[in-house]
Structure formats: C-alpha cells, structure tokens
Amino acid sequence: MKSVLYSVLASFVLASALYVPARAAGLNIETATIADLNAALASGTLTSETLVSAYLKRIEAYDKKGPAINAIITLNKKALDEARQLDVERKNGHVRGPLHGIPVVLKDNYDTVDMPTTAGSQLLEGHMAKQDAFMVKKLREAGAIVLGKVNLSEFAGSGGSVSGATDPAIIKAGSVPNGASSAGGQTKNPHELLHGPAGSSGGTGAAIAAAFAQFGLGTDTGGSVRGPSSANGIVGLKPTHGLLSRAGIVPLALSFDTGGPMARSVYDVAVALGVMTGVDPADDATKKSEGKFERDYTKYLKTGALKGARVGIARDFMGKDAGTDVIVEAAIATLKKLGAAVVDPIKYPDYILQSKGALYNIVTYAEFKAQIADYLKTSEPQFPKTLDEIVARANDPKTGYRSPEKAVALKYTASVALDLTDPSYIAAKNEALVSTKAAVMALFEKYRLDAILYPTSPRPAQYIKPDGLPAPTDSPTNLANESGFPAWSGLPVTISFFGRAFSEGQLLGYGYDFEQATKASVLPKYTPALPSDVIGMTVAGKNP
C-alpha cells in the first residue's frame, strides 16, 4: 500500500493545478525567500526580531505540541537578543550581507560555543565545544542567527548503521528508524506523521519543511542531505568534497563527509552556500577548492539555464517503484521542454553498482572508529573518548540508553571497523575510491554530459517503525560521495542532479530553471500557517 507521503510529494508535480495551499496576501515566512525577507527588512516593514519571533511561534506550536514534529534538540535562548542587536546594526546603516538577521537551524553535529553538540547521542548531552565550526562561524559573521540545533540519526549514521550485516538477528536488533537518536528521540515527517524524515539530516529536513527557520545545515556522507531534502520536499545541496570545511563537525568518515545547505528554495540554498565557502587551514580538503569556489552562487540562477545542457538519465536506479518512475519520466519530459539535450539512458559500469555499498562500508566504519576518537580526545573527562568506550557505555544497563537498537548498531560497527593501517582499508581508499572517481568521470566524458539525473531515492520514504529489514543498497546517493562530486536534490519530484567537481553554480542553475518552470511545491499539511507567519497583513488566500 502506497504511503500518503508518497502521494503528497511525488504526485504533486503531475497534479499541481489541482490544489494550491492558501497563501497570505502579504509576506509569508513559509514561502518567502531570503530575497523577499531582505526587501522587507530594507523597507522597514520587517525586523529580524519579528522574524525570529515568528519562527519561534511555529516551533512552539508544532515541535513539541500539536503534531509534535520533534525536530529541535536545543533552542538558542539568546536568539531574540541577537536579532535585536542585528536590527540596531541595520538601523545604523551596517548590513553585513544577505543573511543579516536571517534565522538558521543546525544539525546537532556542528560545533557551537553557546549550545551543546550531542551528535544525537545521550552520551554527549552537555558536551560543549570550545569554538564554532568553520561553517557556523562564517554564517554568524554574515549576520545569520542560529535559532537552534536539530535532531539527526545518531552520530550521523542513517538508519541503524548495520549496513552490510547478514545476521538477521543483528539486523533486527540494530534497526533504528532514520531521524531517531537517543538524545533527540524520533523526528516525524511534517507531510505525513507516520513516516520518517529520512536521514541522517532528518531533523534539518523536517524543521525546514515545517518552516522552523529560513534555512538549515545538514551533513552528507552517503546521501544524508539529499535523502531528507527529498523526503521533506525541500532543496538540498551536497557540494563537491572540499568546497566546504568540515572543521568543527563531528566526523563520520572524512573521505566522504561534507556539510550542505537545505532550504525551501533554490535561491536560499545558493545564498547560504556562497557565504560558507573558503579555504580553511584546519581542513586540508578545502585546498582543492582554491580558485574554484564562489562567494555568490545566485548569479547562476537564471531561467533558460537548462537549454542546451546535456543531461544523462541513470536508469540503473529506476525500476524499483512504478510510481516513482512515473514521476521521473515526467521530470525528463520537463527537461526536454526546457531545451535540455537528454541522453537516455546512460549506463554505470556493473562493477561500480555491485561494489559501491561494500566500498562505502569499509571506508566509513574504519574512519568513524578512528576519527570519532580524534574528535573526542579534547572533550571533558566525563565524556567517552573512543568508539569502544561509546559501545561499552551504550550497552551498559546502568546507562539506561534510550535507544537500545542504536546500542546494538554501535556494537556492530565496532566489531567490523578496520584499523586505518589495515590493507583492505588502504586498498579501498587509495585504489577503489580512485577507480570509482575515474569511472564516473569517464561516464561524463563518454556521453559529454553536464549532469546526470536520477531519483534521489528509488522508493518512497520509509515508515517510522522499522521493519527489521536491511537498508536498501540500491540508492545512487553514495556515488556522489565516493566520487567526491556535487549533487543536489529536493525538486518536487524527488530527483537529483549529479555534476562534475565544483559545478555547483551550474547545478543550481539547472535546479532553479526547473523550479521556476514547474512551480511544483507543497507545504506540509500538519504544520499549517499561523497568523504570525504573515508580516504586516492577515491571511486572506483561497484555494482556487
């Protein structure tokens, strides 16, 4: 039986003329872009204090009450004070940029000096970082207001982190729904409460869909920005590995890890991305971006961007769900109408498709074991310092771990994680990953492609209740991480564009063109508009 969420999100592009949510006669924070907000702030019809208050009212109404989306782990108690200070700056003629006074939420694996960083684990509750993550620092310098920190799949491990397990008992005991953590509990999808928000950035996805902030930050190791963006009907960008610094982000696997912006519009993603780029001495990977990053990606947002673009269709990732395929076919037809040169189909090498899951697991498990210890070594004495210590505490009955399934999953991770000196890990990192990247590049060259299109997920979003089955291994999202190339998702038809390294501007342009042509979006039915959502005017819209 198909889920309600699938019908709401995936079918909407084909039936967009049938229903349009009521809109306010004025500026509505659910639908306003950062450009809209800046115009209102500049005119004096809006203040950052009013904007922050409006978002806080939505959080108050919908996060722990009503539908109880449960996306927020920690709220910034000083958010209103910061907004007032930024309003004073604006009044005195100092505007830092387009994010001046704009609220953002952070996945709770980004370090912040003023709020704990838990990575979703109760073992890290109260853990305070000594400085902001690089990306957070850049946002704050640009005037963004960190409204709070949001839930995630614990330690950014989507699902139960038992990928690769073959023992049915381990799979069943260690299966955790995406968007659940021992620190934050279970986050719900605001479109359909029986479904999860996907992972691991499920809290960010749900919070942005529910309009708890203007934009948010997620992290992506194998699809963790794109999956939640798709499941929650928003826009997400997984940038090229090295475009954004990971300094101050709790690591999962630095060979793949990257931060990424998530928002309700392509424009907002583009604005946020440009603010956060730059070479960071604390993250050697960012050296790859020198001379390639931009400060303003909005210049690429033009209608007509898809005209003449060569877009390959990766049918290797279709055929898993008939309804999803119908939506992808409709998206392909739209691309053709917009003038794209569609290359259909393109074919990934079989060995890449067959080995990508195992390759991802070898690298991720080994690096998490080593890198979480490196991250925790400077934490206060009361916190665990190694993966083995995390496993011991999580599985100790005295701890009262609130996610016994995650305790099993962590134990499994520790049991299979290789050392970084293990020949199998070294071969995977230095040979197999290099081969994967070369194979993907060869695909772009063979078909002379500007981008590859595929369904972000081959199936609809999962129910919250785990079914005891292993996570699907046929998702294409981890290929973007294994190659290091950028991918962005969140179109109303849950598709992803996958591009060459440092082609973010081009991909955002494609997404913007598609977004403007289809205007296919839907607001979550469980978090409807509040009177305070409308700036200066009352809600007066009607369904056509």
Predicted regions and their residues:
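Short helix-loop capping/hinge segments that flank enzyme active sites or metal/cofactor-binding pockets
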Residues: H100-A119, Y300-G312, V363-T436, M441, ...
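Sec/Tat signal peptide C-region and signal peptidase I cleavage site
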Residues: L18-A24
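Glycine-rich, small-residue loops and helix-cap segments
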Residues: G44, G101, E141, A213, ...
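Gly/Ser-rich, acidic/histidine-flanked active-site/gating loops
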Residues: E30, Y110, P116, F256-T258, ...
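Short glycine/serine-rich loop/turn segments
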Residues: L99-G259, D284-K287, G312-A314, I452-L469, ...
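Short, well-ordered alpha-helical
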Residues: A25-G126, L152-G159, K288-S289, Y297, ...
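Structural helix-boundary/capping segments
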Residues: A61, E141, A209-R315, E329-K336, ...
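Bacterial N-terminal signal peptides
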Residues: S7-A17
